[in-house]
């Protein structure tokens, strides 16, 4: 699957390997940034100039992870990033990790007005898992270039992530690329399970 816009989620069923792309149906808001803005975020002062109400869920009946460009969430699960780089060394879930649940956050949804004056950005209010969020990072000094996050103990290898789900099952994941099979950067598609 490829993401042509920022308004889609790719749902992954880790049991079957099936992926399904669905339009985001969460509540949305557009922010117009200017010095006279009444609210403030990391980009500056803004006013909310448009909203869209949340619609009924369109997620598949069975899914484990969902990706929105580089954002990742679980299906009511918890995640964490380890400093381990060898996926084969993890045989069961460790007990000494800090599990992180999904949280509601404003995720970038519409960037068509980013280069206009005044700047207008669209956001969706959806879930993200901060324990899994750092599987990649923005490369400093670039405009929108991302790279895999590497382990602190071995900067040449990606860390292993752990995810436990509400049914008691779990996944041990190591992201190995930001590119899909065609070499295009846009989604998570190369996962070692």
Language-model-detected regions and their locations in the chain:
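Surface-exposed, beta-sheet-biased, low-hydrophobicity segments with strongly acidic/polar composition
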Residues: 1-193
């Amino acid at each position: 699957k490829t993401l042509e816009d920022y308004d889609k989620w790719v749902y992954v069923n880790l049991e079957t390997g099936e992926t399904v792309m669905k339009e985001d149906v969460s509540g949305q808001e557009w922010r117009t940034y200017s010095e006279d803005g009444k609210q403030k975020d990391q980009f500056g002062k803004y006013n909310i100039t448009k909203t869209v109400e949340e619609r009924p869920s369109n997620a598949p009946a069975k899914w484990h992870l969902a990706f929105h460009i580089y954002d990742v969430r679980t299906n009511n699960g918890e995640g964490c990033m380890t400093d381990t780089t060898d996926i084969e060394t993890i045989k069961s879930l460790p007990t000494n990790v800090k599990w992180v649940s999904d949280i509601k956050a404003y995720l970038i949804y519409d960037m068509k007005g980013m280069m206009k004056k005044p700047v207008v950005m669209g956001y969706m209010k959806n879930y993200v898992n901060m324990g899994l969020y750092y599987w990649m990072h923005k490369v400093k000094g670039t405009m929108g270039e991302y790279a895999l996050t590497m382990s602190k103990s071995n900067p040449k290898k990606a860390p292993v992530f752990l995810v436990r789900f509400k049914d008691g099952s779990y996944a041990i994941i190591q992201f190995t690329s930001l590119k899909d099979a065609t070499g295009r950067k846009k989604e998570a598609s190369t996962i070692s399970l």
